[in-house]
């Protein structure tokens, strides 16, 4: 089974405001680029949407995935915090509702289908995959901004 490498990024103009997400999937010499955006969102939601859309694009289950993000929120949320949230009925340690619970639940479901190595990379530091994912996210943001009333 070959490993699929995914680079993701999100962008937002204002927080909240229009936002975009970008993802690159690479496997066996192939490459697929994805992007999208929303007219009213947050940076964290766009970081999460990039990962969700990339994982949803995988056609088969049981994939070995390396997912590279510059979002500590995304990486720590899915690898550390989510276990406690689920035990507490999607509440934080101080008993408040988890923000972005709709996306965390989607991501949780998607992670069950694959073996995922979640990795963090410093944003805007020259990593080619992160830089391209950022470009895609900004394109998604521009498209979302164009759809605003």
Swiss-Prot record:
Cofactor(s) it depends on = Mg(2+)
Q: Where does Mg(2+) 2 bind?
A: 9, 134
Q: Where in the cell is it found?
A: Cytoplasm
The catalytic activity of this protein is classed by the Enzyme Commission as 3.1.26.4
Query: Looking at the Swiss-Prot or TrEMBL record, what is one Pfam family this protein matches?
Result: RNase_H
Catalysed reaction, written as an equation: Endonucleolytic cleavage to 5'-phosphomonoester
* Domain of life of the native organism: Bacteria
Q: What is its main location?
A: cytoplasm
RNase H type-1 domain residues are 1-142
Q: Which UniProt keywords apply?
A: Cytoplasm, Endonuclease, Hydrolase, Magnesium, Metal-binding, Nuclease
Any keyword Flavoprotein?
no
Chain segments carrying region Disordered: 124-149
Question: Which cellular component appears as one GO term in the record?
Answer: cytoplasm
Tell me which InterPro entries the record gives: RNase_H, RNaseH-like_sf, RNaseH_domain, RNaseH_sf, RNaseHI
The GO terms this record gives for MF are: magnesium ion binding; nucleic acid binding; RNA-DNA hybrid ribonuclease activity
A Gene Ontology BP annotation from the UniProt entry: DNA replication, removal of RNA primer
Give residue spans, biased composition: Basic and acidic residues. 129-149
Membership in a protein family: Belongs to the RNase H family.
HAMAP family cross-referenced by the UniProt entry: RNase_H (MF_00042)
Function of the protein: Endonuclease that specifically degrades the RNA of RNA-DNA hybrids.
Subunit record text: Monomer.
Report the protein name in the record. Answer: Ribonuclease H
Which gene specifies this protein's sequence? rnhA
């Amino acid at each position: 089974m070959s490993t699929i490498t995914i680079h993701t990024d999100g962008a937002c103009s204002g927080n909240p405001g229009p936002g975009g997400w970008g993802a690159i999937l690479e496997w066996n010499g192939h490459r697929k680029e994805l992007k999208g955006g929303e007219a009213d969102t947050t940076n964290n939601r766009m970081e999460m949407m990039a990962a969700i859309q990339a994982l949803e694009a995988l056609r088969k289950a049981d994939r070995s995935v390396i997912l590279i993000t510059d979002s500590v929120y995304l990486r720590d949320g899915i690898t550390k915090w989510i276990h406690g949230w689920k035990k507490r009925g999607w509440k934080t340690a101080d008993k408040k509702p988890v923000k972005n619970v709709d996306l965390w639940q989607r991501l949780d479901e998607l992670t069950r289908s694959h073996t995922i190595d979640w990795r963090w990379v410093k944003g805007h530091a020259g990593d080619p995959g992160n830089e391209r994912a950022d470009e895609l996210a900004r394109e998604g943001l521009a498209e979302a901004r164009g759809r605003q009333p």
